[in-house]
């Protein structure tokens, strides 16, 4: 699920317009960490390729992309709880659970830095609505991935 979601948004981390707006955008990318984790688990070859939501060559609606990145960044806060459970299974921030690791400066500061930058982006009322719609689309995508991968409906 994480691989599919982060594949969906990976192209955003190379977008120069987003890079101008958000601090350390490339450093916030987690897809390669997920790939390393899958290799640690011996399941890298089992991952199916799915066409990502965002591609490098497609036109980008900046507010929509900001909504998707908001969800990705927010998920890193919850990853602290998942990391604790992963450690109980024998994984760590250096093997099997890299993508769950917090930022060197700490999860809270990492999130606040992102949010401070997001709050400074000049957006019209309509743009703000597209940010929210982008975040909602990212949450729906995550739920669809969970339902598909785990084969059962998860309450919304």
Located regions from the model:
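Metal- and O2-centered redox machinery and metal/ROS homeostasis
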Residues: 1-156
């Amino acid at each position: 699920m994480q691989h599919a979601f982060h594949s969906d948004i990976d192209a955003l981390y190379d977008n120069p317009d987003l890079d101008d707006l958000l601090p350390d955008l490339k450093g916030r990318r987690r897809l390669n960490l997920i790939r390393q984790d899958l290799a640690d688990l011996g399941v890298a070859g089992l991952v199916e390729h799915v066409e990502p939501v965002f591609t490098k060559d497609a036109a980008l609606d900046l507010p929509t992309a900001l909504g998707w990145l908001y969800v990705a960044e927010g998920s890193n806060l919850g990853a602290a709880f998942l990391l604790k459970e992963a450690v109980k299974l024998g994984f760590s921030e250096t093997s099997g659970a890299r993508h769950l690791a917090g930022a060197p400066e700490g999860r809270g500061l990492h999130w606040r830095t992102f949010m401070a930058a997001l709050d400074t982006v000049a957006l019209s009322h309509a743009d703000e609505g597209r940010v929210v719609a982008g975040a909602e689309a990212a949450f729906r995508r995550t739920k669809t991935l969970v339902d598909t991968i785990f084969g059962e409906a998860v309450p919304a």
